[in-house]
């Protein structure tokens, strides 16, 4: 089919690399670093980031449980279109519950999705928070904030877990590359 033709033409196996983790755990940093590294290696890849999609594709959504679900549903549907076209996506989204992760997996397809848990303790995330969102959440200025006033369920069985508290982003990116390249490498 079309996807096989595109994968062969692009010389890669299309996958959705889904980064899940607390706010300020390092998803965007890892996602953009990974995108650059993969582009440098000759892969065709697109970063989809929560902060960006919420300004465009999902600008009509808030942070209620229903809106979070719709946010993930839309992103998963877009990701599926990319994968069906032979393109790799890197998705940096909090995706706080197993239910939402399952929804993404159902839409994208289990074989197409590589789940990465970007792990960092909440104290570390809070210390990194330049926008002061955690502080605002603790004072009640921001409601439904993941990790403070809304739950974050630790992924039960991610394909890979990366700890961003102890290593520099460059080291984390190198580690992720080692894990991901064999999965997306094209073999004729």
Predicted regions and their residues:
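ATP-dependent NMP and nucleoside kinases share a basic, alpha-helical "lid"
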Residues: 56-62, 79-138, 144
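Small-molecule kinase domains that catalyze NTP-dependent phosphoryl transfer to phosphate-bearing small molecules
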Residues: 119-175, 183-188
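Conserved beta-strand scaffold positions in the cores of enzyme catalytic domains, especially
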Residues: 47, 113-117, 159-161
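Extreme N-terminal, non-catalytic leader segments
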Residues: 1-17
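Conserved lysine of the Walker
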Residues: 27
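Residue-level preference for the first positions of well-ordered beta-strands
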Residues: 14-16, 44, 88-90
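The conserved Walker
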Residues: 23
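Conserved substrate/cofactor phosphate-moiety recognition/catalytic segment
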Residues: 32-77, 84
């Amino acid at each position: 089919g079309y996807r096989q033709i595109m994968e062969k033409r692009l010389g890669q196996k299309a996958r959705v690399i889904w980064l899940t983790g607390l706010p300020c755990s390092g998803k965007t940093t890892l996602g953009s670093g990974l995108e650059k590294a993969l582009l440098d290696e000759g892969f065709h890849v697109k970063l989809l980031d929560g902060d960006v999609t919420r300004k465009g594709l999902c600008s009509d959504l808030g942070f209620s449980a229903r809106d979070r679900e719709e946010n993930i549903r839309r992103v998963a549907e877009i990701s599926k279109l990319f994968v069906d076209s032979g393109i790799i996506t890197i998705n940096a989204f909090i995706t706080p519950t197993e239910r939402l992760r399952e929804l993404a997996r159902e839409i994208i397809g289990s074989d197409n999705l590589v789940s990465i848990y970007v792990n960092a303790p909440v104290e570390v995330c809070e210390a990194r928070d330049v926008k002061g969102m955690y502080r605002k959440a603790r004072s009640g200025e921001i409601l439904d904030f993941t990790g403070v006033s809304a739950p974050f369920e630790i992924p039960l069985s991610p394909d890979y877990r990366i700890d961003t508290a102890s290593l520099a982003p460059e080291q984390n990116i190198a580690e992720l590359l080692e894990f991901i390249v064999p999965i997306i490498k094209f073999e004729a």
